Amino acid sequence: DDISNFPVIETRMEGQNLKYFSALINVDKVDGFTLSGNGKVDGNGERYWKSFWLRRRVIPKCTNMDELRPRLLHISHSNNVQVSDVRLVNSPFWTTHIYKCDSVKLLNLHIFSPSFPIKAPSTDAIDIDACKNVLVKGCYMSVNDDAIALKGGKGPWADQDPDNGGNCDIIIEDCTFGFCHGVLTCGSESIYNHNIILRRCNLDQAKRLLWLKMRPDTPQQYKYILVEDIKGNVRNCIFIAPWTQFYDLKDRKDMLVSYSSYITMRNIHLDCDSFFAVEKSKQYKLSNFCFDNLTITAKKDVKIDENIIDALVMRKVEINKVN
């Protein structure tokens, strides 16, 4: 748990290529890499978590990277990768980060970091960063941040930087999600996500099922996302709002407009606090959403504001308000 044991290398963090600390396990340009077995990789993150929250008390605007800490597993520029049957726990920072990879299978993993009594900050279970053809199957995830986060770059010129990129052809299926901030999250450093499927999953105590972080300083397109066959309980079913943390337009003068379109949610049976937590904004446009065969109980936000989404289609949507 001593950061001085981790070398500073050229790596990828928070939507930018830079010098930062290596992960505990680092894989770069290794096609066919496999990590498997019934063992456990324990990041021993408690000391880092305590230090992070102490720093945040003294310097409230400190960034996630200001508290120097390593990730658990980082795989980059590698194809035909498989990680299976491993327990990845107590990461100091992001747990599993894949960058610029093609054909990745993450199978039957158990990924955990605590939300109590010490919150493990920024311990995303799986960060998919400018990748394609990724399968996440049969995994259990419970972390004090997002479970599946789709990343790819941030900033007003992010879509013109060759180090960045979109995520496409991603399947997450047959997984169980415990506590997490978002089951499937687009952002916050993300530019283009398309052909994304989340299906046949169970939720228990997650904060959000689908979270679209609309960053006003980054051009973003989230399209062709399918969420289907979901059961359990969640605080918010669909959550869309501007994400302004560390907002920086740099030298760009025009207002960026982002887009989320062709989003389908179907065959979903959930108990939640809020169903439709969608904020209207001039900085993004929402269109071609489809809600199909939904059975929801919710404490609030049971009314779907059809003025927020262009070309919204609803079929067999049952939302019952409960106290």
Task: Please provide the spans of the model-predicted regions.
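Extracellular/periplasmic carbohydrate-active domains that bind, remodel
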Residues: D1-N323
